[in-house]
Amino acid sequence: MAIPKTMEAPFTHLFLNLTVMTLGQILVIPVALLVVYICIRIGSIRRQFRDLPKPPHHAFLGHFPILLRELRTLPRDIFAPLVVDLVRRKFDLPAVFFLDLYPLFNPIVFISDPGLARKITQEDRSLRYPGVFETLYPAIPTRWFRTVADRAWTKWHPVVGVSFTAAHFVRMVPQMAEDLRAMLDQLNDWSDRDEIFCMERVATDAILAMTGRAYFGMELDCFAPKSQWTSAFRAATTPVVAARNPLRKPFVLPSWKRHARTFHAVIREKVQHTFDKDENHEAGVPSLLASSFAVYRKNGFPEFPRVSQEALSTEYLEELTSTGAAFLIGATSGASVISYAFLLLHQHPNILDDLRREHGQVCGFNRQSILLALQSRPRLLNDLKLTHAVLKETLRLFPMGPVLRKCPSETMEYEGRTYDIRNHIVAISHNSLHRRPDLFPNPDAFNPYRFLPGAAIPIPADAWRPFEKGNGYCVGQELAMIQMKVMLLLTLTEFDFQPKYAREAARGPDIYGGYAYTTGSGIGPTPAGGLPMRVDKRMK
């Protein structure tokens, strides 16, 4: 029987409503099941932390609430590991404690015990947690990450495996010191104009210049008004911060890759130029590349067979290019350390006086005498005991942050208890380890004398480890210490430095630098605002 036309519209409307309701009910069921599954999964994860040492723990939200409460009292860009260390202090947590940040991260175990840190890094030879350094791609090529993934890479590497020693770096000191004349002239000009400058930026340029000298054996002109090197370096590294945000990275990545390719091309060209300039086929001016070329010409690298006496193989050239990018970028992390050293010395004038006295007694009391001393006897740097101690104490107070490891074992023993650490991120927390009062008395105080030979209270074994040990240790630590000594020696003789933050600037906890609190807004941990400073010529 046909439905009257007058009834068609109501029936159609009813049918559509029933269809929509049915579809809605169909969609609600899987969504509800998904929500139930997520709640059960989260509850299961949270229960795993029930009997573990940890800060106060929310049954459903884990440790997000307590970290967020702490963050509300701090500057927004503060370095995240400092927040964890403040929580550790507030709740007097032990040297091993756990954080539950699921689902953003796997369970994290924070370690600040030197013996346990030694076992994980040196005895178990655990590797760095996957993806830690990949955040620097494309500034550092993927080739470099594949290289360092090899446990034995430091033995066969065509640069690190040849002449990467403190004795070899000391031979480069005279040229490094000469290359800093331009920096000293720049500081002199800023003093005349009473100009405020960014210390972290100056230190970065200085370390870039000295690292380039060590690697290529040539001056990079990093303090020239339009330096090709500093421009290419900053263009390749500035996007690192924005790219850490997964929502911004897709928009940043195309231009970042373009700038990275330009940076790598500049390095590649310099490597080729260095090889072509080595006319005598032997290392003349001491440099890492000169030593590597000497071995290469003798066909001494099985992984990189020589093409001819006059040419570099493509593989060898690319290895040296990726290594150069990694070294130049990695070395500049020392800029934050040297910046904090200037800040701490300004805050402790008595220590600064002792340091200048040491510089004068060992190398002389003016620029010319220091440069002459370093030219004739570069090993004099080894006699700067207090300078070395100042740098070690600065690294203790302002380390580069925790080292994340992936342990090969499924359990970890500490103080008679066994912990299940399967699928855990193991974080060796230098910020916590270096400020333990039982290891470093009065740990928040700047006291470089504790590192002098014959100190009344010796530093416990494995307690000071800013460069880390075992797999993933900093291969450039000897070069970094030499560079920072040279910079302190040349600058403190002529200049006084003082921080110049605006009154309205954000301020972090005083124990972490106050206005110069450590941020995560650089390649690595960086003083807030790059540590603005004013420089004055010293009164003679």
From Swiss-Prot:
<dbReference type="GO" id="GO:0020037">
    <property type="term" value="F:heme binding"/>
</dbReference>
<dbReference type="InterPro" id="IPR002401">
    <property type="entry name" value="Cyt_P450_E_grp-I"/>
</dbReference>
<dbReference type="InterPro" id="IPR001128">
    <property type="entry name" value="Cyt_P450"/>
</dbReference>
<feature type="transmembrane region" description="Helical">
    <location>
        <begin position="20"/>
        <end position="40"/>
    </location>
</feature>
<keyword id="KW-0812">Transmembrane</keyword>
<feature type="transmembrane region" description="Helical">
    <location>
        <begin position="325"/>
        <end position="345"/>
    </location>
</feature>
<dbReference type="GO" id="GO:0005506">
    <property type="term" value="F:iron ion binding"/>
</dbReference>
<dbReference type="GO" id="GO:0004497">
    <property type="term" value="F:monooxygenase activity"/>
</dbReference>
<keyword id="KW-0472">Membrane</keyword>
<comment type="pathway">
    <text>Secondary metabolite biosynthesis.</text>
</comment>
<dbReference type="Pfam" id="PF00067">
    <property type="entry name" value="p450"/>
</dbReference>
<dbReference type="InterPro" id="IPR036396">
    <property type="entry name" value="Cyt_P450_sf"/>
</dbReference>
<keyword id="KW-0408">Iron</keyword>
<keyword id="KW-0503">Monooxygenase</keyword>
<keyword id="KW-0560">Oxidoreductase</keyword>
<keyword id="KW-0349">Heme</keyword>
<keyword id="KW-0325">Glycoprotein</keyword>
<feature type="glycosylation site" description="N-linked (GlcNAc...) asparagine">
    <location>
        <position position="17"/>
    </location>
</feature>
<feature type="binding site" description="axial binding residue">
    <location>
        <position position="474"/>
    </location>
    <ligand>
        <name>heme</name>
    </ligand>
</feature>
<dbReference type="InterPro" id="IPR050121">
    <property type="entry name" value="Cytochrome_P450_monoxygenase"/>
</dbReference>
<comment type="similarity">
    <text>Belongs to the cytochrome P450 family.</text>
</comment>
<dbReference type="GO" id="GO:0016020">
    <property type="term" value="C:membrane"/>
</dbReference>
<keyword id="KW-1133">Transmembrane helix</keyword>
<keyword id="KW-0479">Metal-binding</keyword>
<dbReference type="GO" id="GO:0043386">
    <property type="term" value="P:mycotoxin biosynthetic process"/>
</dbReference>
<protein>
    <recommendedName>
        <fullName>Cytochrome P450 monooxygenase ptmG</fullName>
        <ecNumber>1.-.-.-</ecNumber>
    </recommendedName>
</protein>
<dbReference type="GO" id="GO:0016705">
    <property type="term" value="F:oxidoreductase activity, acting on paired donors, with incorporation or reduction of molecular oxygen"/>
</dbReference>
<comment type="function">
    <text>Cytochrome P450 monooxygenase; part of the gene cluster that mediates the biosynthesis of the indole diterpenes penitrems. The geranylgeranyl diphosphate (GGPP) synthase ptmG catalyzes the first step in penitrem biosynthesis via conversion of farnesyl pyrophosphate and isopentyl pyrophosphate into geranylgeranyl pyrophosphate (GGPP). Condensation of indole-3-glycerol phosphate with GGPP by the prenyl transferase ptmC then forms 3-geranylgeranylindole (3-GGI).</text>
</comment>
